[in-house]
Amino acid sequence: MSVVSLLGVKVLNNPAPFTSSYQFEITFECLEQLQKDLEWKLTYVGSATSSEYDQELDSLLVGPIPVGVNKFIFEADPPDLRRIPTSEILGVTVILLTCSYDGREFVRVGYYVNNEYDSEELTADPPAKPIIERIRRNILAEKPRVTRFAIKWDTEESAPAEYPPDQPEADGLDDDGAAYGQEEAELEAALLKELQEAEKNESTKGEDHDMEGADNGEEDISDAESEDIEDESDDDEDEVDEEEGNDADEDVEMGDDSEPKDDNANPAAHHSQQEVMVH
């Protein structure tokens, strides 16, 4: 269980000029007294093709952290244009808001950012050299990608398990991999049978409209097979995600839920919101 839970992140100045600072109102809850500060960072992804253009816009130590719900403002400088390829200034990129405790990252929030000109004329016919003062950024604040990691806090008991617990009863269960392979074989056999029947009808009747009907049947079967396989693949992916719980406990999209709940924000309901010291 995480000692610190991120309740919400609100982008304060959005949209804004490209050269404006980034401002976030961050709300989180602390369940225990912490011995050290939290470190927040904002990173700008300068290029989708190479991480060498990533730049840390700012970092902030927050503490001491009182138990309860806390809120603070995180402000970061805009990216250094000299470290961004000219061809990558316009378009869609990503910013990453992360928080670490004692050097161990436990939460990451990613936002898409669209950088575009403030007029349709410049957008339709952009100049060879970008006009920075005419570029505006728009953060897709409604759909952040939030990833949480299990880490060790102040005690050894809080450290995540290095290995999954023993489950001897699982040895007697059916092998999902074998069952999946059997279903694949059954689907292929059914498809082959239908194709053979369609070819047989084609050779006996030889009429164009019968041929069209057989083709449609084949397409329907292929579609059904594709959908089943996709569903099964999704199930497998869900199982893989669960096995990777030690590395990333949760990877969800925070839409409307990214805003802190009323009962958390209400001082009379649970904990009083406290302004924490940043330095």
UniProtKB/Swiss-Prot annotation:
Residues 182-246 form a coiled coil. GO terms for biological process: cellular response to stress; DNA replication-dependent chromatin assembly; nucleosome assembly; nucleosome disassembly; positive regulation of transcription elongation by RNA polymerase II; protein modification process; silent mating-type cassette heterochromatin formation; subtelomeric heterochromatin formation. Keywords: Chaperone, Chromatin regulator, Coiled coil, Nucleus, Transcription, Transcription regulation. GO terms for cellular component: chromatin; chromosome, telomeric region; cytosol; H3 histone acetyltransferase complex; nucleus. It comes from the Eukaryota. Its main location: nucleus. It is found in: Nucleus. GO terms for molecular function: acetyltransferase activator activity; histone binding. Residues 151-279 are annotated as: Disordered. Residues 194-212 have a biased composition (Basic and acidic residues). The keyword Cytoplasm does not apply. It holds the Pfam family ASF1_hist_chap. Residues 168-187, 213-260 have a biased composition (Acidic residues). Histone chaperone that facilitates histone deposition and histone exchange and removal during nucleosome assembly and disassembly. Belongs to the ASF1 family. Interacts with histone H3 and histone H4. This is Histone chaperone asf1. It comes from Emericella nidulans (strain FGSC A4 / ATCC 38163 / CBS 112.46 / NRRL 194 / M139) (Aspergillus nidulans).
